[in-house]
Amino acid sequence: MSDQASDPYMYDDDSSSITPEDCWTVISSFFQEKGLVSQQLDSFDEFIESTIQELVWEDSRLILDQPAQHTSEEDHENRRYEITFGKIYISKPTQTEGDGTTHPMFPQEARLRNLTYSSPLYVDMTKRVLKSDDNAGNEHELEWIEEEIKDEEPSTKVYLGKVPIMLRSKFCMLRDLGEHEFYELKECPYDMGGYFVINGSEKVLIAQERSAANIVQVFKKAAPSPISHVAEIRSALERGSRLISSMQIKLYGREEKSTSNRTIKATLPYIKEDIPIVIVFRALGIVPDGDILEHICYDANDWQMLEMLKPCVEEGFVIQEREVALDFIGRRGALGIKREKRIQYAKDILQKELLPNITQDEGFETRKAFFLGYMVNRLLLCALERKEPDDRDHFGKKRLDLAGPLLASLFRILFKKLTKDIYNYMQRCVENDKVFNLTLAVKSQTITDGLRYSLATGNWGEQKKAMSSRAGVSQVLNRYTYSSTLSHLRRTNTPIGRDGKIAKPRQLHNTHWGLVCPAETPEGQACGLVKNLSLMSCISVGTPSEPILYFLEEWGMEPLEDYVPSNSPDSTRVFVNGVWVGTHREPAHLVDTMRSLRRRGDISPEVSIIRDIREKEFKIFTDAGRVYRPLFIVDDDPESETKGELKLQKEHIHKLLNAEYSEEYATNEFGEEEGPYGWSSLVNDGVVEYVDAEEEETIMIAMTPEDLEASKSSLTATQQKSLQLEEQELDPAKRIKPTNSSTTSTFTHCEIHPSMILGVAASIIPFPDHNQSPRNTYQSAMGKQAMGVFLTNYSVRMDTMANILYYPQKPLATTRAMEHLKFRELPAGQNAIVAIACYSGYNQEDSMIMNQSSIDRGLFRSLFFRTYMDLEKRQGMKALETFEKPSRSDTLRLKHGTYEKLDDDGLIAPGIRVSGEDIIIGKTTPIPPDTEELGQRTQYHTKRDASTPLRSTESGIVDQVLLTTNGDGAKFVKVRMRTTKVPQIGDKFASRHGQKGTVGVTYRHEDMPFTSQGIVPDLIINPHAIPSRMTVAHLIECLLSKVSSLSGLEGDASPFTDVTAEAVSKLLREHGYQSRGFEVMYHGHTGKKLMAQVFFGPTYYQRLRHMVDDKIHARARGPVQVLTRQPVEGRSRDGGLRFGEMERDCMIAHGAAGFLKERLMEASDAFRVHVCGVCGLMSVIANLKKNQFECRSCKNKTNIYQIHIPYAAKLLFQELMAMNISPRLYTERSGVSVRT
């Protein structure tokens, strides 16, 4: 750094303060290192690298005891068979072909051949046989001696199954490849990974939101319930089984009714009744009343709380020994067993099931008692109204389960199943005295198929229990536009019933700030339940808590067992992951130490450290699934000379910038080089810090570095006021800066940039801070339907459907966040010249007029690809179906379309023009000789047609044909068809502000209005679209785009910057235009000046995927349903248009009976029935050729009537008959009087 001249980024020395530009440099370094899907990749890597191994070791020993058989003299030994699981091995993804060869697999091949991108998993298994002598007698434990096994190898590597691999994770083939290698592998360098390829389709795991385990929460209960307050905790072990045992402590009696009998009871797992709290304490070995009270109430002078505890102590007065208390609990758990057993049962429950997160070992009763007391204390504080009840929707008390935990829970179930199978095999072998083969014992299909099934269907759980499992966890990755893909990978889901109209969980909560996007959520039933992560938020993968406990013990934490509340009334309680581990007398010092350890990197940066001064609590969380985000640290050390400034200095910015150009390396404390200076170097230098929602509430955050400067510079309040007045006179539209009174200048952190609170879809909106909030939400949904280039390798991909815009442009008004969303490289829209005017009236109600000449020149044209797929089904080695060109002579049931375009191999050649219902893949199935094919079959027909026709509503050109084999070695074909879609009347377009509209009419160039310079707009939208929607940003975008097209620079439309409409107007004026963007226009037909000036300029428009050609539908006659003989439903099946209940009601109200009859019967399912005039049933046998009619049961051949009723009515009558109800139809002429 000494050689300043060579440094390309040297600033003036006086500008030592951090500018917004510097903040963007830091943000750049964040995205360079992390990317946008790091939360998916990190979580999956954690699963592969450590979780699988832990799950395998969780129940790593299978033990089978075989008692002595005593069949012969020698055979008096007990045998014990033992199988142990050891290390696991996983490699890069491979594919085993049908002929048994194995080769490495790349994602593109998996996509094209419909394979699963997965890696084989192996595990070391060891078997031992131990024996013991039976003659030793049964007084003491049997001694197990290793039985000598001749040359048995110590451990065998056994194949467990295949695990799907997430793309771009550490085990993926594409990790850390260069640009050129991507090209050779036909992968797009912009593809960010984070998804799986299962059977050729790309699947994302959506993050699932849940409440955090191991935290105590107190809630109020509503009036009718006898319980007024309840404290609950859902316990889960930190590592290993997700078995959650929950426990509640309930405060009975409502304060209105009575004050005397407000008892407190606990709900214990596996115990049917609620147990009075005092009895639980006594069962835990805390017997005297005084000790119990001391565990609950930490202040002996707090008479209110002691008064609340009086009824509880009285209730438990009858039981005064530990044994009796245990027996009391045991009686209510296990029925009909002896007293000793009951006591042991109660002991086991208290040890293993009560608060298992503290420990499941014995001898920790005091810890559990203190924690129980803490829960009761929290409950009473809430009941005494000294503390608010907890907020269920607080985001800090939520966790997101990503790929790692989700796959872990699945793998655990499957692995348990596998070990059970191994155990059963072992038992069978021992019983039948067979040789035990490890490789045969393991059913590798269990894990392979189980994982694949869940990822393919989204039903998370076992296949057999598909009903109980969660649905929609895994979804097909949305590949419409690049931003829709990104957004899908950062989506979170809250599994609450969608139908319940509960508002609370759906609302935006204060704690969501910076962690989830405030704008991007769907409309309708999932609103607020499906969220998207903000740009810089990450999710913790979880770190072990042991090192932290070790640190705490080093730094003077007193263990909980030694805690005596009366001796140290002011000490602070220390919690780690919700477990109370001890107390500390100097919390401030401890917190500072822990923070500095975290900033130095001795503790993982994702650990959150929370000190609640008021409640005298110090909480540390290290668990997985916490959402956190980075912030700049403000130096608040009173001794430091940079007090009140950012820890981030100019030198850090220089290092970051230089790392891009020179080989500037970060050095760690040992002076070793660690690669270029980047984001992680900033974290290690203690300049930025990760903060989660819970910790965020204990710190003070400045919005921008400027605010920090303002609070630091000690202007008096009056000086600030006068400064503000001056500013206000300059520009009324300027942002109002918060005035910092000198009391609140205790900032500890600073936002990196406020625009980072937005998610992927909302970051594309220019000036979102100038729009009404729902408009941003609408655009966030619509931006995902815009056409663009979804990936650069679209020409080699065979997606089911793909839309590519001919000529996508980057927007003239950009946001800084777009650089990191690759929106410049892969845009989704075009800059259209837009006039906001009424012209001819064809742009009313959100329609717009489009310039036909622009369309002819290629404006908003797009390509559409659709892929058809088929394969030859096989049974074992013989093929059931064959690709061929079916011939009329020997094939049954040929389709309507033409078979002429097929080649002899049954496939169509690329470049051929096809239209609706043409056959593009010819395929036949052999007919077994003995089947009767509904009377159509003759002896010539040996095959049935199974061809694939083109969709009836589409036409185009065959683009690409891929013939290959799938994983089972069956022949397999994909045919891609392409069409050009030209904008026409009825197609849907939208600007980036939720201003959507359809094309109302297209005028040629000469019919459009023009400006004095002869510029003609591409679009004319209606001015009525603006005022009620308040999308001011739409107008500012137009102004800014106009300026940037004149100046040749990109306009910066990022949110929360100092750009004002006034500033943009000034620039526009300097370029010689009217400052507010109005222009004089001339009528296209007459050439006269228009009466009003027209707001005119370029605006970025998106072509959306709803096109009129894909929706147009009409039908006269066509296919009908088999059962009701009414027209089928849906455009794809050429269905009818439903005349529904509401339409029927309108016709009844209108009184148009003839029309009603025609719609509901004649045009639908009219049917002729013959009815017997005697019995009124449809039992007539009619011979229409001979004109003979007869009702056999009535012996009636003359009194018969022909009526017309809807077929559905006939069906109803027959169904009633089947239920033993006889509907009799009498006509006017049958003369039967129906009594009224």
Swiss-Prot record:
CDD domains in UniProt: RNA_pol_B_RPB2
Keywords: DNA-directed RNA polymerase, Magnesium, Metal-binding, Nucleotidyltransferase, Nucleus, Transcription, Transferase, Zinc, Zinc-finger
EC number(s) recorded for this UniProt protein: 2.7.7.6
Database matches in Gene3D superfamilies: 2.40.50.150, 3.90.1070.20, DNA-directed RNA polymerase, subunit 2, domain 6, RNA polymerase alpha subunit dimerisation domain, RNA polymerase Rpb2, domain 2
EC supergroup of this enzyme: transferase
GO molecular function: DNA binding; DNA-directed RNA polymerase activity; ribonucleoside binding; zinc ion binding
Main location: nucleus
Alphabetical list of SUPFAM superfamilies matching this protein: beta and beta-prime subunits of DNA dependent RNA-polymerase (SSF64484)
InterPro entries in alphabetical order: DNA-dir_RNA_pol_su2, DNA-dir_RNAP_su2_dom, DNA-dir_RNAP_su2_hyb_sf, RNA_pol_bsu_CS, RNA_pol_bsu_protrusion, RNA_pol_Rpb2_2, RNA_pol_Rpb2_2_sf, RNA_pol_Rpb2_3
Residues that hold Zn(2+) according to the record: 1172, 1175, 1191, 1194
Domain of life: Eukaryota
Location relative to the cell: Nucleus
Catalytic activity, reaction form: RNA(n) + a ribonucleoside 5'-triphosphate = RNA(n+1) + diphosphate
Disulfide pattern: none
Consequence of changing residue 519 to V: In strain: MmRL 1759
Keyword field contains Repeat: no
One Pfam family matching this protein: RNA_pol_Rpb2_6
Function comment: DNA-dependent RNA polymerase catalyzes the transcription of DNA into RNA using the four ribonucleoside triphosphates as substrates. Second largest component of RNA polymerase II which synthesizes mRNA precursors and many functional non-coding RNAs. Proposed to contribute to the polymerase catalytic activity and forms the polymerase active center together with the largest subunit. Pol II is the central component of the basal RNA polymerase II transcription machinery. It is composed of mobile elements that move relative to each other.
Family label: Belongs to the RNA polymerase beta chain family.
Record's subunit section: Component of the RNA polymerase II (Pol II) complex consisting of 12 subunits.
Protein name (record): DNA-directed RNA polymerase II subunit RPB2
Organism lineage string: Eukaryota, Fungi, Dikarya, Ascomycota, Saccharomycotina
Gene: RPB2
